[in-house]
């Protein structure tokens, strides 16, 4: 069943914006709203603005999925100059397209110059960014993908891992970084280059695979494989050529 509302609903929603109450969701749109009652979704067209208790959204066009009551929003799909701000979920994003699953708190943004910012982490990509706010999973893939926080800078074609809340801050506890050309990670006073860079907080080991370069304290070590132990502040580099000397450098400061 399809019902089409245009001018009446636009006026209604525009009027409500000046007096939105807690629990209400306000929508404005220049080209009207199509309501699909059986399928439980709305189509909002042209310069859409949504204000709610949990988030604010601006976009060219938006599809909203609801629960059975057509009251609670379960999913948002937005296209065109998308801006999404959610103090409740701690998310702020800009993108060409957006998909937000409300119950699972899973957000995906796509397109050139996409960005997703939380209180502790900044993420950028010309491909896509995905974050699950409940279990901490995240993924960035595409050109110019970057992840930045206070202590780390990562740039690669593919970045994925897990955030954990430690002392009310998001920290990376698992990380896989891949780039067929070269990945780059800067952590405190250490710069690392490799095609693959992995980190597991359980072992405190950063693993570097293929075309490895570690720059630290004025020293530059090159090889094919390397590990950096973040607990005892040491690292190793080795080469596939057995005639080359393996290097182990430890800094006890």
Model-derived segments and spans:
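Mature-chain termini and adjacent capping regions
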Residues: 1-5, 13-253
